[in-house]
Regions:
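Conserved beta strand-loop-helix elements of the APE1-like EEP
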Residues: 2-4
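Membrane-embedded multi-pass helical conduit in multi-pass membrane proteins
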Residues: 82-167
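A broadly conserved detector of short glycine/acidic/proline-rich loop/turn motifs that flank catalytic sites
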Residues: 114, 118, 174, 181
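Catalytic donor/gating beta->alpha subdomain of glycosyltransferases that bind UDP-sugars
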Residues: 6-9, 14-76
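Select subsegments of transmembrane alpha-helices in polytopic membrane proteins
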Residues: 74-84
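Short, surface-exposed, low-complexity cationic segments
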Residues: 182-187
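Membrane-interacting alpha-helical segments
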Residues: 32-33, 55-69, 143-150, 154-161, ...
Length: 187
């Protein structure tokens, strides 16, 4: 997020950052509290090109959702309930179809199609945003759509893993997130 120094000072961003581990959520809160708006700037996006293992990704994702649960609990609950409902419906559909209820197959597929279509749209938008990554998209672009059903289950796992924890590990330190304005260094 970019802002002018005058805006930073008048919105008291430094005060909002005190005791915080999340600069993004607290900056957003400071800007909104000041009655100002935030605009999405697509050209400010940067591609992450580093590699990470599945374990590293899951650790990062759980950390992000723990932070979200502490700083924006309503948003966390909305995401959790949406994933729980979607995965529950998907599981029910698979059970019915596996039990011989082929009538449910079109309904099950209708559950997959919108998410997969959004994946196609995300991939197309990413291609436009990152033209220098055309070779990567040519090789891996398909995952945006075809792994969407699996990704939904991964995110449900991440939501569940973030449900009851307030401790995060970041850059070798463990922090306890007591509130949006109170973070304790554990070790």
């Amino acid at each position: 997020m970019a802002l002018r120094r005058e805006t930073f000072e008048s919105a008291r961003v430094a005060d909002f950052w005190t005791g915080s581990v999340s600069d993004d959520y607290r900056l957003t809160e400071a800007i909104r509290t000041a009655g100002l708006g935030i605009q999405f700037a697509p050209r400010a996006m940067v591609a992450t090109t580093g590699e990470c293992s599945a374990s590293e990704f899951l650790s990062w994702a759980v950390r992000q959702l723990i932070i979200t649960r502490v700083y924006r609990p309503a948003l966390w609950w909305l995401g959790f309930l949406a994933h729980l409902l979607y995965c529950g419906a998907m599981l029910a559909g698979v059970v019915v179809v596996a039990g011989g209820g082929l009538w449910a197959l079109p309904i099950l597929l209708l559950g997959f199609v919108p998410g997969m279509w959004r994946g196609v749209l995300r991939e197309r938008a990413a291609r436009v945003m990152f033209p220098g990554r055309a070779a990567w998209f040519g090789r891996y672009g398909w995952v945006y759509a075809w792994l969407t059903p699996l990704a939904t289950w991964v995110w449900l796992y991440v939501f569940l893993a973030s449900s009851f924890r307030r401790r995060i590990e970041w850059r070798g330190n463990i922090y306890e997130l007591r509130s949006p304005s109170m973070t304790r260094l554990v070790e």
